[in-house]
């Protein structure tokens, strides 16, 4: 069982990493199964937050404008990650945006990724929904601010 990893979630301006931009990165460094440190930043990539995204995430243009520029946020996040694997729910979405943002900065973002959605599909095939809030309820885990 992997006990050291980075749990990550990103918010974006849309669904396409080549066209849309990161708005927020939230992560926790898990070592020996315990949260050791967290990382959170809003990102100002110079793109207004679409109204629909504000409705979905609560992220406003004011929050974006208070954020770091990608040239600061991405290297900072990569340093936070070190060489640890990434864990997330539907992590290919997060990974695609993080990798594209790294490439845009002339950096690389290659590492193992663990997807809790794929794991849930395999282990809980009869569960009607595998959305993160539903999995938290199933396992009686407090989702916090996820």
Identify what each model region corresponds to.
Residues 1-111, 125-145:
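Conserved non-catalytic scaffold segment of RNase H-like nuclease domains
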Residues 111-121:
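A short, structured active-site edge motif that brings together acidic residues
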